[in-house]
From Swiss-Prot:
Name recorded for this polypeptide: Ribonuclease PH
UniProt source species: Escherichia coli (strain K12 / MC4100 / BW2952)
Cofactor(s) the record lists: Mg(2+)
GN (gene name): rph
Remarks, miscellaneous: The gene in K12 strains MG1655 and W3110 (and also other derivatives of K12 W1485) has a frameshift mutation that leads to loss of activity, although the protein may be translated. Thus in those strains rph is an expressed catalytically inactive protein. Strains shown in this entry are derivatives of K12 MC1000 or MC4100, in which the frameshift has not occured and thus are active.
Disulfide-linked positions: none
Length: 238
């Protein structure tokens, strides 16, 4: 039996609260069960030097965890004077995932920074960050349209992410911390709303997995992401 009695293909309750803060062009509090992440999207005119004069925009991301988002307090990375490897890996993943959702040429020379701050961690913080940041990004892009800076919203479609894994020999979707820490195989999958894969991060933590198990996990992820995208669209319709 999984925590909270979920079936193996069932994601945790997902909540997306838009306009959570007042200053950012897009802001969303995303909740995957007890995992809570504040995602904001901020717009700046101009692009990084390597893109100047090319007539296209850029999307970047930063990720961080509050000191007591976990069971025991972790010192802020700013206090340590440098970001950890995990942090850099996750923020690059978020940025790659969301760049796939936008027509950067149609965006023009604007930079959008996605800030994902974990308030409470119970597994799946990177997948929740991508899911929430996507909704914040839609709202930020719409502000550019409303302000007359873009003619149409350059969003190509929704992007969402979910974790899957093998726990106690069974393939499961959207792992909580207790499952994640005991998983034989742990995988994060990012997809477009029509099921195309943007990224797969998979590791055999305890036991190597087969090709057949990989296909099962990807199918499980697709089903979970379809459910999450429906929640994203419902949030945007409100």
């Amino acid at each position: 039996m999984r925590p909270a009695g979920r079936s193996n293909n069932q994601v945790r309750p997902v909540t997306l609260t838009r306009n959570y803060t007042k200053h950012a062009e897009g802001s969303v509090l995303v909740e995957f069960g007890d995992t809570k992440v504040l995602c904001t999207a901020s717009i700046e005119e101009g692009v990084p030097r390597f893109l100047k004069g090319q007539g296209q925009g850029w999307i970047t991301a930063e990720y961080g965890m509050l000191p007591r988002s976990t069971h025991t307090r972790n010192a802020r990375e700013a206090a340590k004077g440098k970001q950890g490897g995990r942090t850099m890996e996750i923020q690059r993943l978020i940025a790659r995932a969301l760049r796939a959702a936008v027509d950067l040429k149609a965006l023009g020379e604007f930079t959008i920074t996605l800030d994902c701050d974990v308030l409470q961690a119970d597994g799946g913080t990177r997948t929740a960050s991508i899911t929430g940041a996507c909704v914040a990004l839609v709202d930020a892009l719409q502000k550019l349209v409303e302000n007359g800076k873009l003619k149409t919203n350059p969003m190509k479609g929704m992007v969402a992410a979910v974790s899957v894994g093998i726990v106690n020999g069974e393939a499961v979707c959207d792992l909580e911390y207790v499952e994640d820490s005991a998983a034989e195989t742990d995988m994060n999958v990012v997809m477009t709303e029509d099921g195309r894969i943007i990224e797969v991060q998979g590791t055999a933590e305890g036991e190597p997995f087969t090709h057949e198990e990989l296909l099962i996990l990807l199918a499980l992820a697709r089903g979970g992401i379809e459910s999450i995208v429906a929640t994203q669209k419902a949030a945007l319709a409100n």
